[in-house]
Amino acid sequence: NEVLKAAGTKWNFLNFFPGLVGGHCIGVDPYYLAFKSEELGYTPEMILAGRRINDSMPTFIVSQIVKQLMKQNKNSQNASALILGATFKENCPDLRNSKVVDVYKELDEFGFNVDIYDPEADPEVFVKEYGFEKLGKLTNKQYDVVILAVSHTCFKAINPKELLVEEGVVFDVKGFYQDPDFLYL
């Protein structure tokens, strides 16, 4: 965040944040370009490196969460996690190639009990595309971990700390809340 803030002093700086890159264009199209480039004898190292980094983000995010729980002497087995956001970008109902699903699957592999809440995503499409359900609404349930995966504007009305058990962990993927107590990329 400090690097992005400093870079923002340049008049023509575009402020892009690290996060979960999905969707049809950025998640897929670089492979078309790489394929054609390699057909013509050129290996686009930078494009492929970018895709490797983007594809590894779900694993990185979950590893940071598990490490934080371990520091607190907590086990991921049967820990509860809430993922806020399922779509591939904010304020959009599109679920295509969403990396949030990969975060869900990684958490599940570590033994977490995972809920997903996304008022923007169509629940029927979500079940059809990914085979599991999302929460229709938030309840009074408290979680060991809350992950803000997608920065929907409607999430500004949510205080993630109110969704946590004591000493719970919030991982704010996009730096949406700017809270010093949260984990960030």
Regions found by a protein language model. Name each.
Residues 1-185:
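Structural/interface elements that position substrates and couple domains in central-metabolism enzymes
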